[in-house]
Amino acid sequence: MTNSVLRVVEHLRERAHDVLIVAPGAGPDSYRGAPVVRIPALDVPGVGSLPIGVPTRTVLTALAGFRPDVVHLASPFVVGARGLAAARRLRVPSIAVYQTDIAGFAAAYGFGLATRAAWRWVRRLHSRADRTLAPSTDSVEQLRLHGIPRVHRWARGVDIERFSPSHADQALRSELAPNGELLVGFVGRLAPEKEVGRLTALAGVDGIRVVVVGDGPELASLRERLPGAAFLGAKYGDELSAAYASLDVFVHTGPHETFCQAVQEAMASGLPVLAPDAGGPKDLVLPGRTGYLLPADRAGFADALVSKVNDLRDDALRARLGEKARKVVLGRTWPAVCSELVGHYEAVQGRIARAA
């Protein structure tokens, strides 16, 4: 289950709402008092770190027994399609949350011919939901351009206590930058769609230490391409908080983000952010105020990355951008965002969409 789904469940349970979760793969059979119905999961060839659920009649059976007022479909693609069909059969309103740029994902994994097919499938699914929620202005526009109706924007929250400059670890900084290097970091899954290899533009730049936090299928390749970088592996909880807050600059490299929670967590941690001028980061980064948006193409990104990182050697500039970055996200708490989601639930009550 994704972090956003867990935060939604927590919000609903704290307010005494009944919740049933249907999730792929092995795991606990409950979360915060909400039962979890488990369905089988399979690895996608070439994308082993992202297993997908196998649709079964269990979805319909579970929903029929639970009798929900609304069905929340988190990033529907395979299992979500079965959930949507079950909701329509039971005449229960549904909300589909668009979280993954499926077409961009397909292209990143070399499935270029599947891009159009992916959009056809996305359109078919989301057109049958009573409301689609997309996390950024860019993703809302993309969905509407592809003919998907009833699209609304619903962003993501951030835990401003978990992610804060106060979690900086001076011992970690000393270990990573023994000679006072500028620590430029990436946090996320090391996979083709993230294009972490763009950080090679910084390889060999004097006074710069690249820090990579995460794991995934590209790890071995990235170690070869970034021999001087520090690879910290996947971090969670307090270690993740410390990793963010101990950096000087945060860089996100992938151009296919529908939102980009890592950017928001970095901002909450008081870091200036460099990210492609594409997708979700366009809503999050205020150029010249909280960081900079760089050209989305690889060559342009590489040139701008080196230039902006060199600019950010200036302590005063980093401090100003980082302070503003945190201020910008202080109002984006999970309770506020989840209350907005409940408003969407209420808006679809009694409405069953027709297939477009």
Residue ranges of model-derived segments:
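Short hydrophobic beta-strand element within catalytic cores of glycosyltransferases
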Residues: 272-275, 285
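Nucleotide-activated donor-binding/catalytic signature segment of Leloir-type glycosyltransferases, i.e.
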Residues: 220-238
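Aromatic "clamp/platform" in nucleotide-sugar-dependent glycosyltransferases that forms part
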Residues: 255
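N-terminal subdomain of nucleotide-sugar transferases
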Residues: 1-40, 334-339, 346, 353
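Short alpha-helical donor nucleotide-sugar binding micro-motif in glycosyltransferases
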Residues: 63, 126, 234-235, 242-247
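Conserved donor-binding/catalytic core segment of Leloir-type glycosyltransferases
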Residues: 177-207, 211
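Conserved acidic donor-binding segment of nucleotide-sugar-dependent glycosyltransferases
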Residues: 287-288, 292-300, 308-315
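Donor nucleotide-sugar binding/catalytic pocket of nucleotide-sugar-dependent glycosyltransferases
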Residues: 23, 119-169, 178-179, 232
